[in-house]
Regions:
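His/acidic/aromatic-lined binding-pocket segments of jelly-roll/cupin-type domains
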Residues: 60-64, 102-103, 110-111
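Glycine- and acidic-residue-biased ligand/ion/polar-headgroup-sensing regions
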Residues: 58-60, 64-72, 79, 87-92
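A short glycine-rich, His/Asp/Glu-containing loop-to-beta-strand
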Residues: 29-66
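Short alpha-helix capping/helix-loop boundary micro-motifs
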Residues: 58, 95-100
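A short hydrophobic beta-strand segment most commonly corresponding to one strand
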Residues: 110-112, 129-141
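Short beta-strand/loop turn elements enriched in aromatics
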Residues: 32, 36-39, 69-85
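Conserved metal-binding segment of the jelly-roll/cupin
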Residues: 104-124
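Surface/interface-facing alpha-helical segments and adjacent flexible terminal/loop regions used
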Residues: 1-29, 33-37
């Protein structure tokens, strides 16, 4: 992945400020709306053994691990093949990929994923499911 220049990405900076300045411990899971078109999904789940890759066209994802650990598979969208076609309303498509890397994520880690970054989140680091609380911030492109 290429380095990002945050001073040229004001919406990403804004999303990071939201993450830094919000205590999510007392907020229930669900969708959170912000005035500038940024929104977030606060979720709690158990990791899984495998999943399809996904990609988005309208939003950048910032995936922030609030508690727990998981790994996220990441690869270039152009190397994937379509599995489930793009749903414009949900801004998601599901893909298959053969050449990818896993990034291990632990409490306090975040990962910025651009539309060119296909990803499969919520994967167990070892073979057993792990309890995770995660915030996925959606930043309009």
């Amino acid at each position: 992945m290429k380095n990002i220049v945050l001073d040229k990405s004001p919406r990403i900076l804004e999303a990071i400020e939201i993450i830094k300045n919000t205590n999510f411990n007392d907020i229930p899971d669900g969708r959170l709306e912000y005035p500038t078109g940024i929104w977030a999904n606060l979720q709690t789940y158990y990791t899984k053994e495998d999943a399809l890759f996904e990609a988005h066209r309208k939003y950048i994802d910032i995936q922030f691990i609030l508690a727990g650990q998981e790994k996220i598979g990441v690869c270039d969208f152009s190397t994937c093949t379509e599995n489930i076609p793009y749903d414009e309303e949900k801004d998601i498509e599901f893909l298959d990929a053969k050449n990818f890397e896993y990034i291990e994520m632990k409490t306090g880690d975040f990962l910025i994923l651009y539309p060119k970054d296909a990803h499969k989140p919520s994967i167990s680091i070892d073979e057993s499911p792990t309890h995770v609380r995660k915030l996925v911030v959606k930043v309009p492109v």
